[in-house]
Amino acid sequence: MSNRKQARLEAKQFIDTLSVQPYPNSTKVYVEGSRSDIRVPMREISLADSLVGGTKEAPIFQPNEAVRVYDTSGVYTDPTHQIDLYNGLPKLREEWIAERADTEVLDDVSSVYTKERLEDETLDELRYGNLPRIRRAKAGYCVTQLHYARKGIITPEMEYIALRENMGRAKYQDEVLTQQHAGQSFGANLPKEITPEFVRREVAEGRAIIPSNINHPESEPMIIGRNFLVKVNANIGNSSVTSSIEEEVEKLVWSTRWGGDTVMDLSTGRNIHETREWILRNSPVPIGTVPMYQALEKVNGVAENLTWEVMRDTLIEQAEQGVDYFTIHAGLLLRYIPMTAKRVTGIVSRGGSIIAKWCLAHHQESFLYTHFREICEICAKYDVALSLGDGLRPGSIADANDEAQFAELRTLGELTKIAWEYDVQVIIEGPGHVPMHMIKENMDEQLKHCHEAPFYTLGPLTTDIAPGYDHITSGIGAAMIGWYGCAMLCYVTPKEHLGLPNKEDVKTGLITYKLAAHAADLAKGHPGAQVRDNALSKARFEFRWQDQFNLSLDPDTARAFHDETLPQESGKVAHFCSMCGPKFCSMKISQEVREYAKGQQGEAGQAIEVKLLDDPLEGMKQKSAEFKASGSELYHPAVSHEEVAEG
């Protein structure tokens, strides 16, 4: 069997047999809002008790508070839910959308292309079987979250987000967990508690978006903005040479498990429409697309043959399926193309290169630019957010921050104001390849010219010398720009520049970028960001290995690495690891210092200082005698979990 057929078979088996797979020692908990149907999911990690004293015969333990973390996995980690990918996810937001009474259910689809696909019987085996009824704004109504926010309305989505962003941090009592460094926010407004009113205000001002198409009621509300937690996007999608519907659905579920806050379907191969339907009906996170890719497929890949009519039908098709945000490369103007002539890598954006080719072939501005107001009118009817694409982003560090890049950025700022006239939500896409010392300029320019609309960047990659490791080169830049104020980071996988990522590449990219986003939250001083770090550090110092694994971003890998050298169960309670061994563990020695300090009725630092300053010669004699009396052994075990177990 070929590798391609094997991959597809395995993916189909995954879909057919998918069952709930909770994280280790974690519980799915729901925090209820002001109404019973606002139930916000979080992952609660239970921790073992700390051994704080006593003897082998009578040890004294102290309980550790469970730690709650942000959870993007939807019902796929909820043991109370029966997974059925053929029937899709629960329609969480359906009632909220209906009760606003500003939408209507359509009798039929509006897109000509969708009608053609539905009438094609040869697609019956591929087609998602449980197609939903389509909604659209009633005539004269706008149904975007930005519109509601500007009207002073706090929607259920906004209340949901406030609860989700807070992650229940007010419940913590342990001062070890709640301690946090101040951070440098670079002007971000980070309140100690996120309220529904704060969410509404940030959306109303355009500083944040809630991607939430009325035809994607399965999505769990989330927010993108620099005054909230830094988010991560995962890219999936087939190509003309690889992947199937089954594999893309598998990647979707995998992406949400490992922390993808949104997912972009960048399919360019066969059956794009059907693939997207399967993804949307089973996605608990917002889905984005680049509609230009599908429009190009409709004209057989000939960029010059693209028309506004084809593009318009594609936008309506995808909006009625439920796509939450469109990447639109409307800022690439004809006069900017010559600016790329001296670049090392020219135009590297797929969407940008398509638009550039069309503009040169017709010698006029692109239909995305000239019909931008019509694009906004379509988006306002379904609440599709616009992700204004950077078609002239630098594809090498040599081209970073050049005239072409920033000229397009200024145009994106102008388009942002136009979209806001229609109450359409906007985020701005950014680079790309940028060396570390030039990253902050990107954030500063974006804030200046794009009116504080959220920034969404691909990395940036900080060097060009590491094919196969570009998740690392870009993770460095992502952490930095997230700190400076970027609201969402688009992940890069190890396959970047080399090939289409598989399931494991998706996981590696996501873990790398969740790490970058978290590092940015810590550096900004986001309230509560340090709780998980503190809990893991405390577990590490106390040799609570299982807690260390379970608190990590990737428990499976952490546990596997530990077990490579200490596979026995006793290794899970040992007061050392294979790095230093039992006699040279710095944390074990530190514990012994603390025990000594307790014996001196003082703090560890004070006890050591007293011993150093108080009659040094006498102190040395005393310790010499103690050492000999104890058998001249350099290290002695402290009371430990394994000793308690033996006792």
UniProtKB/Swiss-Prot annotation:
| InterPro entries, per database record | ThiC, ThiC-associated_dom, ThiC/Bza_core_dom, ThiC/BzaA/B
| Positions of the UniProt region annotated as Disordered | 623-647
Reactions catalysed, semicolon-separated, are: 5-amino-1-(5-phospho-beta-D-ribosyl)imidazole + S-adenosyl-L-methionine = 4-amino-2-methyl-5-(phosphooxymethyl)pyrimidine + CO + 5'-deoxyadenosine + formate + L-methionine + 3 H(+)
Q: Name one Pfam family in it.
A: ThiC_Rad_SAM
A GO term, aspect molecular function: 4 iron, 4 sulfur cluster binding
How does the cofactor bind to this protein, according to its record? Binds 1 [4Fe-4S] cluster per subunit. The cluster is coordinated with 3 cysteines and an exchangeable S-adenosyl-L-methionine.
Q: In which pathway does it act?
A: Cofactor biosynthesis; thiamine diphosphate biosynthesis
- Positions annotated to bind [4Fe-4S] cluster: C577, C580, C585
This protein's record includes keyword 4Fe-4S: yes
> Which residues are involved in binding Zn(2+)?
H433, H497
Listed GO CC annotations: cytosol
Give GO terms for biological process: thiamine biosynthetic process; thiamine diphosphate biosynthetic process
- Keyword annotations: 4Fe-4S, Iron, Iron-sulfur, Lyase, Metal-binding, S-adenosyl-L-methionine, Thiamine biosynthesis, Zinc
Q: What is the annotated role of this protein in its UniProt record?
A: Catalyzes the synthesis of the hydroxymethylpyrimidine phosphate (HMP-P) moiety of thiamine from aminoimidazole ribotide (AIR) in a radical S-adenosyl-L-methionine (SAM)-dependent reaction.
Per UniProt, subunit arrangement is: Homodimer.
What family is this protein classified in?
Belongs to the ThiC family.
The identity of this protein, by name, is: Phosphomethylpyrimidine synthase
Please name the gene that encodes this protein.
Answer: thiC
